[in-house]
UniProtKB/Swiss-Prot annotation:
Residues that bind (R)-pantoate: 61, 155
UniProt subunit comment: Homodimer.
Function: Catalyzes the condensation of pantoate with beta-alanine in an ATP-dependent reaction via a pantoyl-adenylate intermediate.
Stored Gene3D superfamilies: HUPs (3.40.50.620), Pantoate-beta-alanine ligase, C-terminal domain (3.30.1300.10)
Pathway assignment: Cofactor biosynthesis; (R)-pantothenate biosynthesis; (R)-pantothenate from (R)-pantoate and beta-alanine: step 1/1
Gene from which the chain derives: panC
Active site: 37 (proton donor)
Residues noted as binding ATP in the record, renumbered to the chain: 30-37, 149-152, 186-189
GO biological process, one term: pantothenate biosynthetic process
Protein name: Pantothenate synthetase
NCBIfam families per UniProt: cyt_tran_rel, panC
Binding of beta-alanine, residues: 61
Source species, domain of life: Bacteria
One Pfam family matching this protein: Pantoate_ligase
Amino acid sequence: MQSITEIKSLRSQIKAWRQAGLSIALVPTMGNLHLGHFSLVEKAKMMADKVVVSIFVNPMQFGANEDLDNYPRTLDEDKRGLADLETDIVFTPSVETIYPNGLAAQSFVDVPDISLGYCGGSRPGHFRGVATVVTKLFNLVQPDYACFGEKDFQQLQVIKTMARDLSIPVEVIGVSTMREVSGLAMSSRNGYLSNEQKDSATALFKVLNNCAEQLKSGNTDFATLEETAKQSLQQAGLKPDYFSIAQRDTLKAATLDDNKFVILAAAYLGSVRLIDNLQVEV
């Protein structure tokens, strides 16, 4: 596995692969890798001849009161895990490499509509940061495929929309959420939770499942389902940020004409913000 930090070295290797007619898959990450990330790498290996994993804690997608400085950084451990999976390149640029003129002077990518609401409403500027850094990575790696986890479902749809709107020739692939035995979605932020909090956090998946079962049984009173779910989360000790039933592909509010839904949820457990979702087809 090659460990690359500089753009020139990355581009040189990408050019050689392209000249050899090899296909490339990209897995963008912020590090602190877990089994969910490794499942993305496994999917990438199935799709392409060569796999590039980027590890970059992107300051542009963190808000003023968010945990950029405290975000877990486990680079040595991450590299060992990626080497075990026979990843071809791990790209670990510095902030100065990605944003040489600083954030204030950086051009950015905004994806309208689909980036608003849900996490976009709770974290203003977040998806601008995500879309900008992913666009830069797409330009640098020029992948045929890019793998993202479905746990961050709005992010996945934002990136699909961005790639389509900007005519970027990449197939954006969503990979199913990896879960703990308890049902809790794997996340780098789970490391902030105590064992007791992890037990409480399982309520998020349970409430999502209950709502999904109601939809499958024909209940289309979306507003009541959402309100009941929020109350259930509160009773379990979580503070709901949002709980919404949406059209799966557009993320607009669900209507009676829809049959493909995604239930999107975010809730706080102490200071830790958890997100999860379930896709439902009826």
